[in-house]
Amino acid sequence: MPENFGYISQVIGSVVDVSYRYTSGGLPKINDALQITHSNGKVLIVEVQQHIGEDTVRAVAMDSTDGISRGMKAVNLGRPISMPIGNQVKGRLLNVIGETIDGMKCLSYENTKSIHCDPPKFKDLSTSVEVLFTGIKVIDLLAPYLKGGKIGLFGGAGVGKTVLIMELINNIAKKHNGFSVFAGVGERTREGNDLLREMIESGVIRYGKEFEEGMRLGEWDLSKIDYEELKKSQATLVFGQMNEPPGARSSVVLSGLTIAEAFRDQSGSDGHDVLFFIDNIFRFTQAGSEVSALLGRMPSAVGYQPTLATEMGKMQERITSTKNGSITSIQAVYVPADDLTDPAPATTFTFLDATTVLDRKIFELGIYPAVDPLNSVSRILDPNVLGQEHYDTAQKVKQLLQRYKELQDIIAILGMEELSEEDKLVVNRARRVQRFLSQPFFMAEAFSGIPGVMVSREDTIKGFNMLMNGDVDYLPEQAFLNVGTIEDAIEKGKKLTALT
């Protein structure tokens, strides 16, 4: 097959125009990948986004355009960007175009899958409703996650979204033996490094004993990696970090999703229930808005791209459960200036089955995870799915916390003394409930000094029922902070009482 190529006619930032005026081949299709080779042999992949006139295409670069000039040859690969799939990607770190970035041996690209593909057909979708319990009290009780659903973690800067995502990866890998794909979208490179180290330490990614012993001594010797052990890893990481151009940041979600789909759709009994983590979905939107103006689109509200809902919908529609397996998506959503009405988080809301909202005021109280129990919702908080006892307990907790919220204005103006005895009891009990919604995390052990815990649904319901019934009103408030079960709170209460 003859090589189909054009010549670069214009470069503006990360957008490249390629002219086919003087070549015999036809124009590449939308989403086709073009390959540009520098004089030093370095390869740049660009993705076709628009046809301009009869003989020019406009493409978005997946890496820096430094060193690119007019007149350079751009070869049409005749296919979209494709990701390597199969067991070979377990435990590996990849970039947006499927290249390894972990310094280990290269992958085979014989078995690949396009990052642009259609969602599953309607007849292949699964309709079963199953709960994914996380071992985190506040989530399992008040906003439980649907297996195969889409979950959003909403919060401003620095309230704990990434720590919560890392805890969920750890808990679900341990509890459900699930496979995880993590897409790092426009976040700090340091966080990606921390995540990899945490995953190696917790056994989610397996580099082998010899490497792990060296890592504990401060070494990072890739020659010590056991590749047989690596194949037993339970996660793949795909990164398009904040120092990369917007093309990479907007497409890396699709790259990660493609790998997750491949694991879900494996034939026979190998079909997986996959967890797909995105940190941060806002950066996907932000990258799209950066590229949008360069592509000549008129910006819409607050400067976002006019195609925001379309781009989000295309991606979210692919995250679904089939009869062969499921993809449960957990998406961190940065909320600009803590404003949930901003178009980016507001558009994301419409696709989700459950939302976990992290609140700065709760964070400032020292309650971690800083989940807002009144704003966090789930469509499966239903007695037909969870059972009557779970549903009743959750509703009682929410009613108590709502009443406490209403009383806070009165307390701020008049003080506790002006409340009725009944309202004083509500306040004292609600403060205990609020603190009992906190929990020590495995991923925070290093800086909190408190061992992490997973709490079963039964223990969670039992603990909150005892709180609501007043069985533990005699314990000091501090006894309920950063404990797992109600038994842990009683034990801590005894120690605190003994100290006083």
Swiss-Prot record:
GO cellular component, one term: proton-transporting ATP synthase complex
GO molecular function, one term: ATP binding
Domain of life (superkingdom): Bacteria
Predominant place of localization: membrane
EC number: 7.1.2.2
CDD domains: ATP-synt_F1_beta_C, ATP-synt_F1_beta_N, F1-ATPase_beta_CD
Keywords: ATP synthesis, ATP-binding, Cell inner membrane, Cell membrane, CF(1), Hydrogen ion transport, Ion transport, Membrane, Nucleotide-binding, Translocase, Transport
Subcellular location field: Cell inner membrane
Catalytic activity, as annotated: ATP + H2O + 4 H(+)(in) = ADP + phosphate + 5 H(+)(out)
PROSITE patterns: ATPASE_ALPHA_BETA
Membrane-spanning ranges: none
Topology of this chain in the membrane: Peripheral membrane protein
A Pfam family matched in the record: ATP-synt_VA_C
Amino-acid positions noted as binding ATP in the UniProt annotation, renumbered to this chain: G155, G156, A157, G158, V159, G160, K161, T162
Gene3D superfamilies, sorted: 2.40.10.170, Bovine Mitochondrial F1-atpase, Atp Synthase Beta Chain, Chain D, domain 3 (1.10.1140.10), P-loop containing nucleotide triphosphate hydrolases (3.40.50.300)
Sequence similarity: Belongs to the ATPase alpha/beta chains family.
Role summary: Produces ATP from ADP in the presence of a proton gradient across the membrane. The catalytic sites are hosted primarily by the beta subunits.
Subunit structure: F-type ATPases have 2 components, CF(1) - the catalytic core - and CF(0) - the membrane proton channel. CF(1) has five subunits: alpha(3), beta(3), gamma(1), delta(1), epsilon(1). CF(0) has three main subunits: a(1), b(2) and c(9-12). The alpha and beta chains form an alternating ring which encloses part of the gamma chain. CF(1) is attached to CF(0) by a central stalk formed by the gamma and epsilon chains, while a peripheral stalk is formed by the delta and b chains.
Name of protein: ATP synthase subunit beta
Source species: Azobacteroides pseudotrichonymphae genomovar. CFP2
Taxonomic classification: Bacteria, Pseudomonadati, Bacteroidota, Bacteroidia, Bacteroidales
Gene that this sequence comes from: atpD
